[in-house]
Amino acid sequence: MKNSLVRGFTLIELMIVVGIVAILASIAYPAYTSSIIKGKRAEGRVALSELMQQQERFLTQRNTYLEFSNSGGVTVPATVPFKTFSGETLLGSAYLLSAGLCPGGPPAILLSECVQVIATPIKPDPAAGNLQLTSAGAKTCSTGTMDCWK
């Protein structure tokens, strides 16, 4: 008599495990990507706050804010004394930073009175778009929602 013992998984057992892993992955992946986007948004908010502090220092020294652009692949002049990206390096950054006049109607707003700093995401963020902060303290998003500042 030969006593053979067969060990292993059947195909149905393997398919059940694959199905369970697929269900877990479909739940975990959107939560993971959402937390990554929120983390990058936090990086943009911190960078805007730091840039606004630098702008206020510049205002006290020169009696005006500094206007510069860093979007659409435009190179920022070397004379800008501020960091124009959100991360430690440009390649590791989630946002490009720029500064300009505050939006507003008549009477005209001067650059010595108000500045708006803008963080433009390098990778699109449809929920928030651009993060914007003015020297008057107004926090806005280009999408119109305030979820980006939460």
Where do the language-model regions lie?
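Flexible, active-site-adjacent loop/turn segments at secondary-structure boundaries
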Residues: 27, 34, 57, 63, ...
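Periplasmic/extracellular, small/polar-rich flexible segments of pilin-like filament-forming proteins
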Residues: 60-150
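Residues at secondary-structure transition points
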Residues: 6, 38-42, 46, 106-110, ...
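Amphipathic alpha-helical recognition patches that constitute DNA-binding helices
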Residues: 31, 43, 47, 114
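N-terminal single-pass transmembrane signal-anchor helix
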Residues: 1-35
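Conserved hydrophobic beta-strand within the GNAT/NAT acetyltransferase core sheet
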Residues: 11-14, 55, 119
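Alpha-helix exit/C-cap motif
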Residues: 38-42, 49-71
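Hydrophobic beta-strand core positions in alpha/beta domains
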Residues: 19-22, 45, 52
